[in-house]
Design a protein with these regions (language model features):
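Solvent-exposed alpha-helices and their adjacent loops that cap or buttress functional pockets
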Residues: 38-40, 55-58, 76-80, 93-94, ...
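Structural signal for hydrophobic packing residues in well-ordered secondary-structure cores
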Residues: 2-9, 27, 93, 136-143, ...
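Short, glycine/charged-enriched hinge/interface segments at domain edges or termini
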Residues: 45-211, 346, 350, 366
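Helix-rich terminal scaffold detector
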Residues: 159-286, 290-296
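Conserved active-site and cofactor/substrate-binding residues in soluble primary-metabolism enzymes
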Residues: 11-18, 42, 60, 101, ...
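Intrinsically disordered, low-complexity, positively charged segments
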Residues: 1-56, 145
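Flexible glycine/proline-rich
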Residues: 12-21, 26, 39, 72, ...
Length: 387
């Protein structure tokens, strides 16, 4: 799948506040020292430290106050020996000063401050470039931008940034038996839960899919509909129609519109998956069984999404731990079962049939059971994938 996934190269420039969760398209390099000047880390007074030599409580050093500077101000003149400037936190340290004393440590008397102890060169002193030096790579190309990254980019003075275009994704379900929530449930029908699970999961992962509803069990109509999206989306996801039944239409759909990459994968649940290409569009047709479609979405589609978006790491988040519960079935093929993972313990719900979705609520992991594994007893050490 990843070999046929074309990373999106298109770049767009967006306002910084709209870049959260986006993939940075070019390195962000500091063009100036940050902070751009020496500054005070506290409210106090700046002066030359040499003037405090020998100062003590009984014989404090005296400095004449010649000005005041808040953050954002700039004291232009050089401060002579024996003089001090009052500074607020973040204010630039004036020329001629090499230390700052806390304002609560001094006594103000007759427009002078009395300093009761010696200070050293660069005491209470923040240097220009202490956070980031000019020329430093601040945020690397390919980084998924978090709130902290936005703060770094803002500190570089960037109001806009270049990011990868978001993957364009469409999602639909197949099946004449499906109705949308909110509609009357007629005899023989079921509500379409798959569409909502996968659309919601896509949004949780930061992707905004086009949710296209339900396609009929008619290969010609479904093929025509999906083909109409070939130039509009990078990835088309469907659920249902992938097994060998009379109305499993996705085989014929793929023959009509594109090239099949594979059908079936050696895992349970969700083995009957079809992957295909149609022009530049990649298609993944997942099982119609609710948990099977959810599991194969996580295992197969999620890495594709990461690759499309240009993320540098598409690996699963792996975990190891111990079973809190027994799993009574042998696994002749590789099997993934839902679980809740916390503090190194995997807890398995009582219901784990591929057609059941209810027990998936509250689960945050899939346990990976190798092929040829006998039933598992509680306490067995296992590996899993975190969702």
């Amino acid at each position: 799948l990843l070999e046929h996934t074309k990373k999106i190269e298109a770049v767009e420039e967006v306002p910084l506040l709209e870049a959260l969760g986006r993939i940075l398209a070019e390195d962000a390099v500091a063009t100036f020292d940050n902070p751009p000047f020496d500054r005070s880390p506290l409210d106090g007074y700046a002066f030359a430290a040499s003037g405090t030599k020998g100062a003590q409580k009984e014989a404090p050093a005296s400095f004449r106050i010649i000005g005041e500077e808040c953050a954002g101000d700039f004291f232009a003149q050089e401060v002579p020996e024996g003089a001090a400037v009052r500074l607020m936190t973040g204010a630039a340290i004036p020329k001629g000063c090499d230390c700052v004393v806390r304002q609560e440590d001094v006594t103000v008397q007759d427009e002078c401050i009395l300093v009761p102890y010696e200070l050293h060169h660069h005491e209470n002193y923040c240097f220009a470039g202490e956070d980031v030096r000019k020329g430093t790579l601040a945020v690397k190309r390919g980084t998924e931008l978090t709130a902290a990254h936005l703060g770094v980019l803002a500190s570089l003075g960037l109001g806009t940034v270049k990011v990868r275009r978001r993957p364009r994704i469409a999602i639909a379900s197949t099946g004449d038996e499906l109705v949308l929530p909110g509609e009357p449930l007629r005899p023989g029908k079921i509500y379409n839960s798959n569409l909502y699970v996968l659309a919601g999961r896509l949004r949780e992962l930061g992707f905004g899919p086009e949710v296209l509803g339900i396609l009929p069990d008619d290969a010609a109509k479904a093929a025509s509909f999906i083909a109409g999206w070939r130039e509009k989306v990078d990835l088309f996801l469907t659920t249902g129609g992938v097994s060998v039944g009379k109305k499993d239409i996705m085989h014929e759909v793929v023959r009509r519109i594109g090239t099949r990459l594979f059908w079936r994968v050696c895992i349970k649940p969700g083995a009957p998956v079809i992957a295909y290409t149609a022009g530049d569009m990649l298609g993944i047709a997942l099982s119609g069984n609710p948990f099977a479609s959810y599991a194969t979405f996580e295992l197969l589609t999620r890495p594709v999404l990461a690759a499309l978006a240009g993320r540098s790491d598409v690996a699963y988040r792996a975990a190891e731990g111990f079973l809190a519960d027994a799993f009574p079935k042998p696994s002749y093929g590789r099997r993934f079962i839902r679980a809740h993972y916390a503090d190194g313990i995997f807890s398995i719900p009582a219901q784990h049939d591929s057609g059941s979705l209810f027990s998936a609520a509250g689960c945050n992991a899939l346990i990976d059971i190798p092929a040829g594994t006998e039933p598992l007893v509680a306490g067995t050490r296992v590996k899993g994938v975190l969702l």
